[in-house]
Design a protein with these regions (language model features):
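Thiamine diphosphate
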Residues: 2-6, 12-210, 214, 217-366, ...
Length: 366
């Protein structure tokens, strides 16, 4: 049954954009954000790509490296979301190959390859199914360099499609980043645009530490922009200000960026200026960028799709409070998913633009 559901995921993603329009939710293609300073050169001379095409382009460049391989369920024929399309044809079966349906085995195999000097890219077909590999990631990959005194490294990349997709339910729509941002030794990334996805993916491939690259699957086809077809990287641990503002700072990442942008635009029409920050990297994260913004505005809202209690936003709010306590003019606020398993009725569960607008008004008028 899982196979049948997974096979239909491509159709679900394609349909979700139209469904979202019918229900009035925000679409990523409505927004174009300017590159941050220093990134414009890397992104110029672009070709229009959606996010899955940008990931495919990044993987193509990565596989051109001598000791890089790609493995996972169905990656040889292109994968459920087509991110690995034609890569086996171009790079051969020794570089791109299928694995059995066992996440623990996929990641464990990748850890072994990394331990002997290869740089594997392991795909977990849905982030919801990453938990059988939790021990391999947290107890093996993340600790490998530490327990060898940095004499050996475990440079590997785990790709995992994540987050809401329209009506994926409890096993195909979860945001699981908070389980891994608590683990020293890992680097965690979640892009919000095609150009970010390619540049950050290639930077992860250059890292000597294990990286988890979460790909918001609702953006695979709905997020479209010009992407440089050549090799380029973007730095890990660096966020960017998408919209400058003076009244309140809003911090987010992944597909929630577009929801936050819609809420910020709605607030602007009511005379409220929102500064919007896309973290991009969750571990490490750009603590200084956020602190500087909050000290300027005096107010902050953190938003993500994952449940609120003990979520990643709690760490952000705690750190912001430590750094900006004397500058805060209102309590830091979190607008997150509900503390329930992920339901089929996503619009009820997710922190949509109307919930964010209410939070913006509440914080600004505190």
């Amino acid at each position: 049954m899982r196979r049948l559901f997974d096979a239909s995921a491509t159709a679900v993603v394609a349909a979700s954009s139209a469904a979202a329009k019918r229900h009035g939710s925000v679409q990523p293609s409505e927004f174009v954000f300017a590159p941050a300073p220093g990134e414009e050169e890397a992104m110029r001379n672009g070709v229009k790509m959606n996010l899955f095409q940008a990931v495919n382009s990044g993987l193509d460049h990565a596989l051109s490296k001598e000791r890089t391989v790609l493995l996972g369920e169905d990656v040889a024929f292109g994968g459920v979301f087509r991110c690995t399309l034609d890569l086996r044809k171009k790079h051969g079966p020794q570089k791109v190959f299928d694995s059995p349906l066992t996440e623990q085995g996929i990641v464990g195999f990748a850890v072994g390859m990394a331990a002997v000097g290869w740089h594997p890219i392991a795909e977990v077909q849905f982030a919801d199914y990453i938990f059988p590999a939790f021990d391999q990631i947290v107890n093996e990959a993340a600790k490998y360099r530490f327990r060898t005194g940095s004499n050996f490294h475990c440079g590997m990349l785990i790709r995992a499609p994540c987050s809401a997709v329209g009506h994926g339910g409890i096993y195909h729509s979860q945001s699981v980043e908070g389980y891994f941002t608590h683990c020293p030794g890992l680097k965690i990334v979640m892009p919000s645009s095609p150009s970010e996805a390619k540049g950050l993916l290639l930077k992860c491939v250059e890292e000597n530490d294990p990286c988890i690259f979460f790909e918001p699957k609702i953006l695979y086809r709905s997020a479209v922009e010009e992407v440089n077809p050549d090799y380029y990287t973007l730095p890990l641990g660096k966020g960017r200000i998408l919209v400058e503002g003076r009244d309140v700072t809003m911090v987010t990442y992944g597909s929630q960026v577009y929801v936050a942008a819609k809420a910020a635009e709605m607030a602007r029409k009511e005379g409220i200026s929102v500064e919007l920050i896309d973290l991009r990297s969750l571990l490490p994260w750009d603590r200084q960028l956020v602190a500087d913004s909050v000290k300027k505005t005096g107010k902050v809202i953190v938003t993500h799709e994952a449940p609120k209690t003990s979520g990643y936003g709690a760490e952000l709010v705690s750190s912001i409070t430590e750094d900006c306590f004397l500058s805060l003019e209102a309590p830091p606020t979190r607008v997150c998913g509900l503390d329930t398993p992920f339901p089929l009725h996503e619009r009820l569960y997710l922190p949509n633009e109307l919930k964010l607008l209410d939070a913006i008004k509440s914080v600004v008028h505190f």
